Structure formats: C-alpha cells, structure tokens
A protein has these predicted regions:
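Terminal-region recognition feature
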Residues: 1-193
Length: 193
C-alpha cells in the first residue's frame, strides 16, 4: 500500500456500472475512488427510486466487483468508509481475480464479502515510494507510518477473524491467500458462485 496518485489519464472511466453491478477493475487512487463513490451514490439513488415506484418493500442490493492490485491507501480507506455508510441498500463486495493491498479496504466495506473461487487476496504492510527530505522529515514520516500501521491492524482485527498476532505475521510478507484461507480468517463470508 502506498500513498501515490494514479498514473492513468483522468479522462478515462475505470469504474463501470451494469444494472446493480459495479466493476472496480483498476488501481486504487483518488480519481478511481472518487469515480466509484459518485457512481455508487447515483446507483443507490436510482435503485431506491425504482424500488419505491414498484412498491417493493425490500432493500435494493448493489454488488461491487473488485479486481485491483491496490494503490493509494488513503483512497482505499475513503472507499471503505463510503461503502460502509450506505445503509439504505445492501452492498456486497466480491473479489474477482486479485484483490490486493489498498483494494482490500474496498472489499472490507461491504455488508457481506465474497470472492470468486480462483481469486486471491493479498494484505501486507505499508510500503513507501522514494522520498527526500531532512532527517526530521524522515522521523515524522516514520511516526505517521507507524500510526497508519496500527490503524490498519485495528481495521483488519475488527473486520475479520484474524487474531492480532497472526495478522502481524501476515502483514510482514506478500503472500496471496486463497478462498479457503480467506473464509477461515473471516476476510470473506463465502465463495461467490
């Protein structure tokens, strides 16, 4: 997970909506997460109006399909918060292929979480791209990174069944987890069929 901005042009759309399905098949960055949040809010509003017009007495469902190698951690956390705040609709998140790094926070935002049978999930510690500065800048940066890591551990412990001691070991490595392990750890609820 890094704190870098997208390297892709801003004119392109990377988040697609098809019916009640939202496809996030891209890098996690300010641009793509803003696009995701805006499209989710619009879809939520459309579905609520549709269900009201049809006099359906149930909560609409939105499925977010995630295929991402990760990206900017702050954007991932922003997406997680936005998804979790959508209380008027049921939001399912589904890892499809690879859901790594900052993208796992998008996954954790879902009310129910799933992954396709041949998908993998990767969680790991923060990494820092090249930086320059004075000695005190490095000390400040290290303090900030330690604070972020504590918060990440809190989120994973709160949102999954991974014990803190096991989580510390997982975060030190870059090891992909299959569906069996992700279900055992409570990262996802089930395999999506």
């Amino acid at each position: 997970m890094s704190v870098a901005e997208c390297e892709r042009p801003h004119e392109e759309e990377y988040v697609q909506v098809r019916g009640s399905d939202v496809y996030f098949y891209c890098e996690v960055c300010e641009t793509t997460v803003l696009e995701l949040i805006m499209k989710l809010r619009k879809l939520e509003k459309e579905l609520l109006h549709k269900y009201l017009d049809l006099d359906l007495h149930m909560r609409p469902e939105i499925r977010i399909w995630i295929r991402s190698d990760g990206g900017d951690i702050h954007s991932g956390l922003s997406a997680m918060d936005a998804i979790a705040s959508m209380k008027r609709v049921k939001v399912r998140t589904i890892a499809d292929g690879m859901c790594a790094s900052a993208a796992t926070f998008i996954l954790l935002g879902g009310r129910t979480r799933h992954m396709t049978e041949n998908s993998y999930i990767l969680i790991h510690q923060l990494n820092m791209d090249g930086s320059w500065g004075k000695f005190q800048d490095y000390k400040d940066q290290m303090e900030n990174l330690e604070q972020f890591m504590r918060r990440f551990r809190e989120i994973y412990v709160q949102e999954t069944k991974i014990p803190d001691d096991k989580l510390k070991k997982i975060l030190r490595r870059d090891v992909c987890m299959n569906s069996d392990k992700c279900i055992d750890y409570g990262i996802v609820d089930s395999v999506w069929i």
